[in-house]
C-alpha cells in the first residue's frame, strides 16, 4: 500500500457503514485523517460502529443529521447504497464538500494494478473466473470490491506484484473521478437499478465511468453481442477488445462450439465447467483478460474446465445417485433463468421456480420451458408460473418452500437427471434474500445425500 499524505489531518465524514464504510474508516485513520462515521443503524445494534469507537474513531448512529455537516468536513466518503438524493448528500454537494467513493480511495493507495469488472449480469462469476485463471497462471490475484471484500481493506495488504481483481457495481462507479483500471470488463448492459439511477441512460453513464480515465495503453473488454457496445466503443480512449458468442471479432469469440482468442482455439464450449450461454460469455471475457495478462492457453483451458461456478450462481452442488444438483438462486428474473436453462437438456431437467409476485406473466419464459421433464413451482408467483407451465405443456407439482421442492424433485428424478433451482423471481415472499433461499437448497441436498 502506498502511504500518501493527501488525507493527513483532514476532517472526513464516512456516510453509511456496512463493510465498505468500515474499511474506508480504518484506512483513512491509518492515513492520518480525522474520521467521523455516521450510520443510520442504532449504536446498540451496530457492532461495526462499536468496534470503530473502540479504535478511537468518532461515531454518530441512529440517523443522518444534516446539521452534522456544519462541522466543516473537507471530504465525504459515501456508502454506495446511499443515493445522491439523500438529504445529507445533497447538503454536502451544496456546501461543495468533495465526495469520494470507497473504490477510488483504494485506487489512490494501491500499489497493485487493477482489473475492474462491471455489468448488469455475470459480474461475480466473471470476476471469480478471472482471479482463478490468473492465480492458476502463477500470478497473485486478489478478489475485491462488490464481491464481498472491500477494496479499501484488500488494498492494504496488496503489493506491486499483486493484481486487484475488482467487481464494481454501478453504485460504486457513479461517483468516481480519478479511478483508472489497467483492464476493464463490461459484461453486458441491461435496464436495472433504475430506481437508483433514474433512467437507463444514467445507469449506462455510471457503468461507463469505469473507463473515464483509461488511455490507449489500457484495455476495455466489451460485449459485442450488444449494439450499445459499438456506440460506446467510439467514445473511449482505451484499446477495445470485443468478445462475442454471435460473430467472429478481433478478440474473444465463439465459433462452431469453440472459444477462440484472435484465431487461437482455447477450449470447447462443452468442456466449460459451468453450463449456460451466459457462462460462455463470462468465459470469453475471462479469456480476453487472461491473454492480455500473458496466461498460457493450456492453463486457461484447464482452469475454465474445472471452474465450478460461484455460490448461488448456477453453482454445481454435486450428485446423488447420478442425479446432479445446480443452485441458481441468484436468478431473480426471467432473463437469468433463460440463460441458465440454455445449458441443459430439458428432457432430463427438473426445474424449481417461483417466488415473489411482481405482477409479471412468464410468457417470455415459455419457449425455454418446452420439453422440461417436470417443474416444481413455489411462492407468490405460483399461479403465474403455472400458466407458463401449462402453455409449455410441462407437468408440475407445487411446494411450500425450497426444501420441500428439492425433496419432491429428488423423488421424481432418475439416474442422469438434473435438478435446477433457478426461480426467475426474487426471494422476498419467503426468504430475506436469494442467499438464504439458496442455502436452504444446499442444506436439503446435504440431508438427501446423507440419507442416500
Curated annotation (Swiss-Prot):
GO BP field: cell division; cell wall organization; peptidoglycan biosynthetic process; regulation of cell shape
Pathway where this protein functions: Cell wall biogenesis; peptidoglycan biosynthesis
Annotated keywords: ATP-binding, Cell cycle, Cell division, Cell shape, Cell wall biogenesis/degradation, Cytoplasm, Ligase, Nucleotide-binding, Peptidoglycan synthesis
Enzyme Commission code: 6.3.2.9
InterPro entries: Mur-like_cat_sf, Mur_ligase_C, Mur_ligase_C_dom_sf, Mur_ligase_cen, MurD
Source organism, top-level taxon: Bacteria
Enzyme class: ligase
Swiss-Prot/TrEMBL catalytic activity: UDP-N-acetyl-alpha-D-muramoyl-L-alanine + D-glutamate + ATP = UDP-N-acetyl-alpha-D-muramoyl-L-alanyl-D-glutamate + ADP + phosphate + H(+)
GO CC annotations on file: cytoplasm
Compartments, as annotated in UniProt: Cytoplasm
Residues noted as binding ATP in the record, renumbered to the chain: 119-125
Molecular function via GO: ATP binding; UDP-N-acetylmuramoylalanine-D-glutamate ligase activity
Physiological role: Cell wall formation. Catalyzes the addition of glutamate to the nucleotide precursor UDP-N-acetylmuramoyl-L-alanine (UMA).
Family label: Belongs to the MurCDEF family.
Name the UniProt record assigns to this protein: UDP-N-acetylmuramoylalanine--D-glutamate ligase
Lineage of the species this protein comes from: Bacteria, Bacillati, Bacillota, Bacilli, Lactobacillales
Amino acid at each position: 500500500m502506498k502511504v500518501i499524505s493527501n488525507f493527513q489531518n483532514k476532517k472526513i465524514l464516512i456516510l453509511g457503514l456496512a463493510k465498505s464504510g468500515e474499511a474506508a474508516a480504518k484506512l483513512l485513520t491509518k492515513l492520518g485523517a480525522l474520521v467521523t462515521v455516521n450510520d443510520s443503524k442504532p449504536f446498540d445494534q451496530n457492532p461495526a460502529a462499536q468496534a470503530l469507537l473502540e479504535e478511537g474513531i468518532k461515531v454518530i448512529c441512529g440517523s443522518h443529521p444534516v446539521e452534522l455537516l456544519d462541522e466543516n468536513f473537507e471530504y465525504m466518503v459515501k456508502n454506495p447504497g446511499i443515493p445522491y438524493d439523500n438529504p445529507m448528500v445533497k447538503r454536502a454537494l451544496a456546501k461543495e464538500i468533495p465526495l469520494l467513493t470507497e473504490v477510488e480511495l483504494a485506487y489512490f493507495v494501491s500499489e497493485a494494478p487493477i482489473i475492474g469488472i462491471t455489468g448488469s449480469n455475470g459480474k461475480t462469476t466473471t470476476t471469480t473466473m478471472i482471479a482463478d485463471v490468473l492465480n492458476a497462471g502463477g500470478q497473485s490475484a486478489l478478489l475485491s470490491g462488490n464481491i464481498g471484500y472491500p477494496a479499501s481493506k484488500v488494498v492494504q495488504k496488496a503489493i506491486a506484484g499483486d493484481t486487484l481483481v475488482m467487481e464494481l457495481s454501478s453504485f460504486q462507479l457513479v461517483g468516481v473521478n480519478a479511478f483508472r483500471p489497467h483492464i476493464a470488463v463490461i459484461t453486458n448492459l441491461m435496464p436495472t437499478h433504475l430506481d437508483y439511477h433514474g433512467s437507463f441512460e444514467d445507469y449506462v453513464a455510471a457503468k461507463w465511468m469505469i473507463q473515464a480515465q483509461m488511455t490507449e495503453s489500457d484495455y476495455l473488454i466489451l460485449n459485442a453481442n450488444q449494439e450499445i457496445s459499438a456506440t460506446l466503443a467510439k467514445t473511449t480512449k482505451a484499446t477495445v477488445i470485443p468478445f462475442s458468442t454471435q460473430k467472429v471479432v478481433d478478440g474473444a469469440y465463439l465459433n462452431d462450439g469453440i472459444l477462440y482468442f484472435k484465431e487461437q482455439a482455447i477450449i470447447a464450449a462443452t468442456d466449460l465447467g459451468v453450463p449456460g450461454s451466459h457462462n460462455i460469455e463470462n468465459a470469453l471475457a475471462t479469456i480476453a483478460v487472461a491473454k492480455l495478462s500473458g496466461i498460457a492457453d493450456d492453463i486457461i483451458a484447464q482452469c475454465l474446465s474445472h471452474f465450478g461456478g460461484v455460490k448461488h450462481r448456477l453453482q454445481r452442488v454435486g450428485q446423488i445417485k447420478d442425479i446432479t444438483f445446480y443452485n441458481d438462486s441468484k436468478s431473480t428474473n426471467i432473463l437469468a433463468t433463460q440463460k441458465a436453462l440454455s445449458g441443459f437438456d430439458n428432457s432430463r431437467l427438473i426445474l424449481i421456480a417461483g417466488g415473489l409476485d411482481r405482477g409479471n406473466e412468464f410468457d417470455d419464459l415459455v419457449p425455454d420451458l418446452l420439453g422440461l421433464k417436470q417443474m416444481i413451482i413455489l411462492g407468490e408467483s405460483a399461479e403465474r408460473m403455472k400458466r407458463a407451465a401449462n402453455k409449455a405443456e410441462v407437468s408440475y407439482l407445487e411446494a411450500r418452500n425450497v426444501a420441500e421442492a428439492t425433496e419432491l424433485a429428488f423423488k421424481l428424478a432418475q439416474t442422469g437427471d438434473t435438478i435446477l433451482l433457478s426461480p426467475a423471481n426474487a426471494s422476498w415472499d419467503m426468504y430475506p434474500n436469494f442467499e438464504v433461499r439458496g442455502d436452504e437448497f444446499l442444506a436439503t441436498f446435504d440431508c438427501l445425500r446423507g440419507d442416500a
